[in-house]
């Protein structure tokens, strides 16, 4: 008998911006998911990411997205905030219908070199992998959910703070964003520990 593998992919978006949250997602895909549709979220157009976001949410076995806000990033640093977001995303996995995921996980793959402090059952393989967001389907899916969720939140912040034009740069350290900050000062969602 062939055992099914339940692989949970975890990735984050938003480690480098000067403003806004760091966002992590965790995803468990079914074995029949059309993986050829996936790619590293950074290589996909925004339109394609949004289409895939809905598909992943509908077809996944379980998924979760978590934001850690700028003030917590300043308090515990970006690495610890990223790991906390990943931990919380894993611990809050839910089915597409919104029920808490109580099923099994046979392997957890985290993009990068640091593994969050997760409470997992014995026998669960836990690995980190650099560039997993370009090679591992469940991590690719997590990358897409994290990026789309964070981008949508930054667009909402642009409505609260239109002068910062977050809808254009999503808080990343672009020339435009740096010029705005130098001209009018930091926004209420600025990461104070990041240099402009």
Predicted regions and their residues:
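RNase H-like, Mg2+-dependent phosphodiesterase core
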Residues: 1-196
């Amino acid at each position: 008998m062939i055992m099914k593998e339940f692989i949970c992919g975890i990735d984050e978006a938003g480690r480098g911006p000067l403003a806004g949250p760091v966002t992590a997602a965790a995803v468990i895909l079914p074995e029949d998911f059309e993986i050829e549709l996936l790619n590293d979220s950074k290589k996909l157009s925004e339109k394609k990411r949004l289409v895939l976001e809905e598909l992943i949410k509908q077809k996944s076995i379980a998924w979760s997205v978590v934001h850690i806000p700028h003030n917590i990033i300043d308090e515990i640093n970006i690495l610890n905030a990223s790991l906390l977001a990943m931990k919380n995303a894993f611990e809050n996995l839910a089915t597409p219908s919104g029920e808490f995921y109580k099923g099994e996980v046979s392997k957890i793959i985290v993009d990068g070199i640091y593994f969050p402090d997760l409470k997992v059952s014995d026998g669960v393989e836990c690995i980190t992998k650099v560039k997993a967001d370009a090679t591992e389907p469940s991590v690719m899916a997590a990358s897409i959910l994290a990026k789309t969720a964070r981008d949508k939140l930054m667009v909402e912040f642009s409505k609260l703070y239109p002068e910062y034009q977050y809808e254009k740069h999503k808080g990343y350290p672009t020339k435009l964003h740096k010029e705005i900050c130098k001209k009018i000062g930091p926004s209420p969602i600025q990461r104070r520990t990041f240099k402009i």
